[in-house]
């Protein structure tokens, strides 16, 4: 039932009792820019500190700048015992024994009101106890270069996940929690954060068919297992290369690309054979952008969007199993079940949002489509406007690489980190400080350790940055929360129970948890502080070329990931189950998308200049891209498809995913559906973001509004940053996100989070320059 931490955001839609905190996985996506009027006034700002400047040397110098302590030796992440792979397996076994003792304590809590009052705290402790090892193991599985460590991490991961699966459907735990929530005195004694945590546990149990008879509960477990297997198969199918298509050399006459295009034509002439072009290859992308003849583009589009019957059947089986699972627990559809604890709440509200967004976006998209039709008309010398087909989009509007809003000097990785640290100091009084890692603390020499330092409270967390590409490391950009915030001084561990010999068995787990606990100034209690890891795959610096120069999309990616990281750092709650990024799926992307908006401000961009010697030019750096609206509209259509596929419709015996997709394209889409295509089998987010694909559009709309209404005029204003931290970031998932947004925007009418609130968000203009393909 539990899923990989690498897709934790996608799993928040089915919050398990013991969820992974995990990481946020984000695929890079094309961004198309729109023209903006940018203020050229650069505000007065705090000078770069020595720590800020040290970040430049840390990340830009290939040798000599790597901070290592020659005198200290420890284990992974500073845990003294984690010095070899066997220690990770041993830690998992110790944690399992300790978790079993705590589980037994919770099960016996009904014997006294004193113990019942501690049930929510103990459930959260149990979740953290298991997740602390599982999330560390998940990071090791995806980043450690040593195969023995990876194998040990797999073993630890599987051992504890098996126990978590038992807890997720444990009727005894459910009954104890029911006893707590049925007691008005106990409920009134819970803090708002504790009560929210209790409700999350309660909903998790109910989604696990906990109150059903044994036969139906077994059916739930069976369906959940089927869904996991089908989901993995679907993702494998989605990434399977499509077969090549045959292209005649004569069809490539007049290619606009004079490099690769000429080489392809010479190859065809030399072999005297048709070219075999694989969809998704560099050659295919070149042809889609450069071939004046429509036929090779059409053939490649058909090949790229083809599916086997088996691939379609796997997807439809997955959708049907999900629908059956939802109906088993008394819900009308999988969307109804999934959206219950989201901002949207119901499928109807998602429809309200998407309909409003469609109404707003359609005029811009149609205008852009008309521009493309005019280009096609001129190209073919036609007397009337032709229809734009799916294979015309890239030829008449070639995708441009993302570019900054104003000309900038080359930005190195270290320079961008310096700018981030300076931005965080302006907004939150928080900065990044390089610190030496001890021998054995990190898993590769590339990894750098940063302290996150608050000007009043000191160290509030740690970021381990593993930023350079290498063999065996997970691809893409990712944010892993290895450890969440949690208050620990009220754990009452002495009450967990014991049996003969258990003291030694649980010692490793106790020592593991004791690391990184701190008493912060001006804050009651002792806290476990957050620890996150950033994984990227940038080019490493070299002696000959110097620091890594980032492309603009890489700068955007880094800002996006650091938005998640600061959410983890500032969302320091007393309960780990609601800390940092552990919030609703349709809210969690807001901080990361908002961070990308800051890159539209010259005042923020000036923070990349440590000495204030560079001059920002007034002239904009890019042209209007008419296809931005088309791409946004296409993403809205995918969100609508996602809702259709998770509605009661899928249980109709005549359900056909291809027919539904084609009908939507022909009735509400911009470009006609192409018979014979079935893109849905490649829409991988249908698994990870099932019934919640709207979330990214939703958070884009909210982030655009927050930027324009709160930050755009003065993005370095400390009062605004403190308001955002106070009203949004510090709560993690412990507060209703609608209340957070309503307070931040001074829009009390949004607080209800009802159908009208969803429609209102749909009417907001998505004013970002952060593209359309979801990072998630």
Curated annotation (Swiss-Prot):
Its EC number is 3.4.24.59. Binds 1 zinc ion. This is Mitochondrial intermediate peptidase. Disulfide bonds: none annotated. It is found in: Mitochondrion matrix. Keywords: Hydrolase, Metal-binding, Metalloprotease, Mitochondrion, Protease, Transit peptide, Zinc. Zn(2+) binds at residues 560, 564, 567. The keyword Mitochondrion applies. The active site is at residue 561. It comes from the Eukaryota. GO terms for cellular component: mitochondrial matrix. InterPro entries: M3A_MIP (IPR033851), MetalloPept_cat_dom_sf (IPR024079), Neurolysin/TOP_dom2 (IPR024077), Pept_M3A_M3B (IPR045090), Pept_M3A_M3B_dom (IPR001567). It catalyses: Release of an N-terminal octapeptide as second stage of processing of some proteins imported into the mitochondrion. Cleaves proteins, imported into the mitochondrion, to their mature size. While most mitochondrial precursor proteins are processed to the mature form in one step by mitochondrial processing peptidase (MPP), the sequential cleavage by MIP of an octapeptide after initial processing by MPP is a required step for a subgroup of nuclear-encoded precursor proteins destined for the matrix or the inner membrane. Residues 1-38 form a transit peptide. One of its GO terms (molecular function) is metalloendopeptidase activity. One of its GO terms (biological process) is peptide metabolic process. Its cofactor is Zn(2+). Belongs to the peptidase M3 family. It comes from Coprinopsis cinerea (strain Okayama-7 / 130 / ATCC MYA-4618 / FGSC 9003) (Inky cap fungus). Its main location: mitochondrion. It is an enzyme of class 3 (hydrolase). CDD domains: M3A_MIP (cd06457).
């Amino acid at each position: 039932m539990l899923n990989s931490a690498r897709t934790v955001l996608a799993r928040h839609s089915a919050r398990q009792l013991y969820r992974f905190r995990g990481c946020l996985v984000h695929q890079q996506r094309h961004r198309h820019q729109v023209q903006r009027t940018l203020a050229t006034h650069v505000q007065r700002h705090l000078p770069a500190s020595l720590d800020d400047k040290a970040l430049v040397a840390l990340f830009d110098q290939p040798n000599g700048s790597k901070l290592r302590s020659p005198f200290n030796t420890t284990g992974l992440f500073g845990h003294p015992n984690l010095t070899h792979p066997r220690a990770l397996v041993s830690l998992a076994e110790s944690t399992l024994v300790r978790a079993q003792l705590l589980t037994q304590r919770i099960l016996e809590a009904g014997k006294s009101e004193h113990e019942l009052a501690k049930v929510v705290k103990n459930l959260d402790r149990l979740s953290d106890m298991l997740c602390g090892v599982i999330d560390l193991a998940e990071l090791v599985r995806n980043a450690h270069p040593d195969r023995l460590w990876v194998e040990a991490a797999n073993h630890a991961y599987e051992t504890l996940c098996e126990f978590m699966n038992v807890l997720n459907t444990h009727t005894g735990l459910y009954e104890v929690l029911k006893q707590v929530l049925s007691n008005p005195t106990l409920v009134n004694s819970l803090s708002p954060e504790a009560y929210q945590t209790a409700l999350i546990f309660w909903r998790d149990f109910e989604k696990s068919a906990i109150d059903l008879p044994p036969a139906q509960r077994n059916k739930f477990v069976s369906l959940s297992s089927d869904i996991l297997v089908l989901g993995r198969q679907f993702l494998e199918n989605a990434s399977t290369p499509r077969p090549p298509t045959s292209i005649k050399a004569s069809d490539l006459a007049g290619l606009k690309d004079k490099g690769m295009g000429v080489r392809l034509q010479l190859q065809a002439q030399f072999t005297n054979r048709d070219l075999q072009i694989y969809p998704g290859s560099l050659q295919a992308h070149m042809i889609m952008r450069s071939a004046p003849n429509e036929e090779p583009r059409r053939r490649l589009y058909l090949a790229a969007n083809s599916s086997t019957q088996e691939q379609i059947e796997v997807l439809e089986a997955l959708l049907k199993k999900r629908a059956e699972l939802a109906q088993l627990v008394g819900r009308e559809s999988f969307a109804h079940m999934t959206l219950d604890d989201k901002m949207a709440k119901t499928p109807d509200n998602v429809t309200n949002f998407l309909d409003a967004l469609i109404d707003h976006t359609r005029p811009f998209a149609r205008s852009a489509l008309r521009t493309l039709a005019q280009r096609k008309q001129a190209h073919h010398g036609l007397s009337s406007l032709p229809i734009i087909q799916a294979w015309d989009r890239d030829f008449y509007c070639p995708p441009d690489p993302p570019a900054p809003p104003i000309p900038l000097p080359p930005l190195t990785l270290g320079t961008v980190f310096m700018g981030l640290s300076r931005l965080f100091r302006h907004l939150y009084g928080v900065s990044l400080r390089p610190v030496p890692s001890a021998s054995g603390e990190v898993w590769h020499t590339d990894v750098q350790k940063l302290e996150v330092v608050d000007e009043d409270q000191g160290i509030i967390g740690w970021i381990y940055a593993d930023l350079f590409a290498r063999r065996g490391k997970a691809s893409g950009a990712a944010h892993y929360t290895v450890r969440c915030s949690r208050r620990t001084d009220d754990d009452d561990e002495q009450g967990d129970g014991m049996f003969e010999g258990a003291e030694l068995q649980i010692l490793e787990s106790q020592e593991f948890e004791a690391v990184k606990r701190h008493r912060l100034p001006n804050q009651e209690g002792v806290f476990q502080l957050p620890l996150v890891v950033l994984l990227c795959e940038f080019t490493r610096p070299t002696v000959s070329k110097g620091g890594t120069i980032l492309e603009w999309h890489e700068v955007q990616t880094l800002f996006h990931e650091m938005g998640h990281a600061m959410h983890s750092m500032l969302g320091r709650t007393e309960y780990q189950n609601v800390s940092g990024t552990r919030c609703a799926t349709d809210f969690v992307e807001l901080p990361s998308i908002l961070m990308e908006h800051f890159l539209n401000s010259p005042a923020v961009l000036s923070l990349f200049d440590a000495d204030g010697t560079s001059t920002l030019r007034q002239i904009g750096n890019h042209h209007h891209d008419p296809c931005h609206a088309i791409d946004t509209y296409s993403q809205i259509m995918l969100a609508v498809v996602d809702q259709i596929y998770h509605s009661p419709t899928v249980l109709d015996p005549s359900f056909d995913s291809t027919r539904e997709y084609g009908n939507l394209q022909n009735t509400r889409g911009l470009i006609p559906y192409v018979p014979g295509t079935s893109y849905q089998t490649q829409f991988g987010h249908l698994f990870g973001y099932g019934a919640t694909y709207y979330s990214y559009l939703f958070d884009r709309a909210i982030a655009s509004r927050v930027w324009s209404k709160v930050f755009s005029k003065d993005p370095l204003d400390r009062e605004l940053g403190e308001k955002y931290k106070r009203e949004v970031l510090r709560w993690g998932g412990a507060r209703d996100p609608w209340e957070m947004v309503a307070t931040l925007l001074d829009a009390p009418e949004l607080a209800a989070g009802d159908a009208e609130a969803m429609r209102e968000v749909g009417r907001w203009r998505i004013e970002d320059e952060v593209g359309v393909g979801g990072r998630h």
